[in-house]
Amino acid sequence: MRNKICEELNNTDIGKLVNLCGWVDRRRDHGGVIFIDLRDHSGFLQITINPDDGADLFKQAETLRNETVIMVSGIINERPKDSINTNLSTGELELKVKDLQILNQIKNNLPFPVSIHDYENTKEELRLKYRYLDLRRGKLLENLKKRHKIIKVAREFLDNFGFTEVETPLLTKSTPEGARDFLVPARLSNGEFFALPQSPQLFKQLLMVGGLDKYYQIAKCFRDEDLRADRQPEFTQLDIEMSFISEEEIISFNESLIKKIWKEVLNINFNNAFPRMTWQAAMDNYGTDRPDTRYQMLLKDLGGVLGNIGFNIFTKAIKSGGYIKSITVKGGNSSISNVRIKPGGDIFKVAQDAGAGGLAFIRVKGDELETIGAIKNNLSEEHIADILKITEAKDGDLILLGAGDKQIVNQSLDRVRQYIAKELNLIDKSKWNFLWVTDFPMFERNEDENRYEALHHPFCSPKNIKSKDSENLKKEIESSTANAYDLVLNGLELGGGSLRIHEANLQRQVLKTVGLTDKEIDEKFGFLIEALEMGAPPHGGIAFGLDRITMLIIGADSIRETIAFPKNQQAKCLLTNAPSNVSESQLKELDIEITIDE
């Protein structure tokens, strides 16, 4: 049907007869001549139809509506100099039409304009419902092509290092990995369910036990959790696992992979090793294990200075084992008003939404500190000197303080830090600040349920375990850091991994630490324990979020812009109206009865 696509055309085609297929992007009538912007998947070309070319042809062209599918044949001409479009690769060319065929008319008015000229004015709900029209606009297609290139580069890199791509099951066993599972009823086993995998974690470990040595997979994963801009109920991981490997070797190898992707896709070179930071340093200085290091405003601990000045909120925070921390906003006295950091203000609300009771503040004015009387009246000259030294605050700076539970203080000041950085344009968006975060704790304490929870997952290997007897082993595990590492970019986690537990006894003890009984371990993970007893090699790996990598590379705000047919933030597919009801006969086959609470 066609012998060229738009992007292939250049000055060497002038005078040649070509056949093109595509959509009518726009039609314009000027001085008795019809101009049509023909669009295909590769780009645009202006085509012209003159009454002198034939009355029937001209009449047919007059009926064309935007998005009509056409095939045209004609001669490539050079455009007049005053009509050259320097924004198009074909902007110096046009096609003088000799023949036009309508391949498909549009039936109704479109729900939104497909032309790139109206791209920004369309609500996302409509774009998701009519995703095929959104794809046709080109921007989304370019995103998908960029995603394809990322995958291609990763595959070639891993293939060259002797990795084998293996598909692992999508119908598997429900195991406690953190988020809720998506369950699939098993018709042939009444009352039993498969689960869609949250990750290929256990299968890739079993591949190492099987001697595969180096594995990777572009893996579909599923988590039934609340959504946000960078999450979807189904998502894609670049999943990697290796045998007989150290943590240092995994970090170094995967850093090379990421550098290769950025080089091939964006033509950006990183000559130096990515910096590293321990989990504890990240939490102390940024309040998060995913720090954005493109700007300052580091968290500073003022507990030793303010904990005993007699201000009740500060005293209570320290006595209960909490924090008093601060961030310093350079020049904040002029850029942030009191209204914004008091109850009802936008910055106050950011802290409140993160769980904080509020924000205290200190304004530095010359050698004096301006704050509420209950704080100021209890500050000695020594206190003031210590505050200025720790916070590194100068005249004109604003110090914001949080006090209370450690997690809430860190979380709220982290959110406030991010919010202010965006509001004051402190972020250099041209920077790619990669960071390895290492030495995570094995567990975090769930005080509500009086038990430990794995910070990553319960298959991470603890560091420096020496004990063999159960009681001492239990104590060592509980206080150990993990052989775990995350790669963070500009405040977002790109991927995370660890060395895995390859000894059955240690794996059983870790699972007991997170609250499972021996019986529960055998029921849920018996197959893994058994495999580890049969000569499992030391192994480890990492999983990168492919959707998130693509989002950052293309500069999008949501991973929905990297996925052909994503769900919305209510986990619904607006295109197919899924999830949806199923028939009574289908439910009967599965022996499932649905009851809905009134």
From Swiss-Prot:
<dbReference type="GO" id="GO:0004815">
    <property type="term" value="F:aspartate-tRNA ligase activity"/>
</dbReference>
<dbReference type="InterPro" id="IPR029351">
    <property type="entry name" value="GAD_dom"/>
</dbReference>
<feature type="binding site">
    <location>
        <position position="177"/>
    </location>
    <ligand>
        <name>L-aspartate</name>
    </ligand>
</feature>
<protein>
    <recommendedName>
        <fullName>Aspartate--tRNA(Asp/Asn) ligase</fullName>
        <ecNumber>6.1.1.23</ecNumber>
    </recommendedName>
</protein>
<dbReference type="InterPro" id="IPR045864">
    <property type="entry name" value="aa-tRNA-synth_II/BPL/LPL"/>
</dbReference>
<feature type="binding site">
    <location>
        <position position="223"/>
    </location>
    <ligand>
        <name>L-aspartate</name>
    </ligand>
</feature>
<keyword id="KW-0030">Aminoacyl-tRNA synthetase</keyword>
<feature type="site" description="Important for tRNA non-discrimination">
    <location>
        <position position="30"/>
    </location>
</feature>
<dbReference type="GO" id="GO:0005737">
    <property type="term" value="C:cytoplasm"/>
</dbReference>
<feature type="binding site">
    <location>
        <begin position="545"/>
        <end position="548"/>
    </location>
    <ligand>
        <name>ATP</name>
    </ligand>
</feature>
<feature type="region of interest" description="Aspartate">
    <location>
        <begin position="201"/>
        <end position="204"/>
    </location>
</feature>
<keyword id="KW-0963">Cytoplasm</keyword>
<dbReference type="InterPro" id="IPR006195">
    <property type="entry name" value="aa-tRNA-synth_II"/>
</dbReference>
<keyword id="KW-0436">Ligase</keyword>
<dbReference type="InterPro" id="IPR047089">
    <property type="entry name" value="Asp-tRNA-ligase_1_N"/>
</dbReference>
<feature type="binding site">
    <location>
        <position position="456"/>
    </location>
    <ligand>
        <name>L-aspartate</name>
    </ligand>
</feature>
<dbReference type="GO" id="GO:0005524">
    <property type="term" value="F:ATP binding"/>
</dbReference>
<dbReference type="GO" id="GO:0006422">
    <property type="term" value="P:aspartyl-tRNA aminoacylation"/>
</dbReference>
<feature type="binding site">
    <location>
        <begin position="223"/>
        <end position="225"/>
    </location>
    <ligand>
        <name>ATP</name>
    </ligand>
</feature>
<feature type="binding site">
    <location>
        <position position="500"/>
    </location>
    <ligand>
        <name>L-aspartate</name>
    </ligand>
</feature>
<comment type="subunit">
    <text>Homodimer.</text>
</comment>
<dbReference type="GO" id="GO:0003676">
    <property type="term" value="F:nucleic acid binding"/>
</dbReference>
<dbReference type="InterPro" id="IPR004364">
    <property type="entry name" value="Aa-tRNA-synt_II"/>
</dbReference>
<dbReference type="InterPro" id="IPR004524">
    <property type="entry name" value="Asp-tRNA-ligase_1"/>
</dbReference>
<dbReference type="InterPro" id="IPR004365">
    <property type="entry name" value="NA-bd_OB_tRNA"/>
</dbReference>
<comment type="function">
    <text>Aspartyl-tRNA synthetase with relaxed tRNA specificity since it is able to aspartylate not only its cognate tRNA(Asp) but also tRNA(Asn). Reaction proceeds in two steps: L-aspartate is first activated by ATP to form Asp-AMP and then transferred to the acceptor end of tRNA(Asp/Asn).</text>
</comment>
<dbReference type="Pfam" id="PF02938">
    <property type="entry name" value="GAD"/>
</dbReference>
<comment type="similarity">
    <text>Belongs to the class-II aminoacyl-tRNA synthetase family. Type 1 subfamily.</text>
</comment>
<keyword id="KW-0547">Nucleotide-binding</keyword>
<feature type="binding site">
    <location>
        <position position="232"/>
    </location>
    <ligand>
        <name>ATP</name>
    </ligand>
</feature>
<dbReference type="Pfam" id="PF01336">
    <property type="entry name" value="tRNA_anti-codon"/>
</dbReference>
<dbReference type="InterPro" id="IPR002312">
    <property type="entry name" value="Asp/Asn-tRNA-synth_IIb"/>
</dbReference>
<dbReference type="InterPro" id="IPR012340">
    <property type="entry name" value="NA-bd_OB-fold"/>
</dbReference>
<keyword id="KW-0067">ATP-binding</keyword>
<dbReference type="Pfam" id="PF00152">
    <property type="entry name" value="tRNA-synt_2"/>
</dbReference>
<dbReference type="InterPro" id="IPR004115">
    <property type="entry name" value="GAD-like_sf"/>
</dbReference>
<keyword id="KW-0648">Protein biosynthesis</keyword>
<dbReference type="GO" id="GO:0050560">
    <property type="term" value="F:aspartate-tRNA(Asn) ligase activity"/>
</dbReference>
<dbReference type="InterPro" id="IPR047090">
    <property type="entry name" value="AspRS_core"/>
</dbReference>
<feature type="binding site">
    <location>
        <position position="493"/>
    </location>
    <ligand>
        <name>ATP</name>
    </ligand>
</feature>
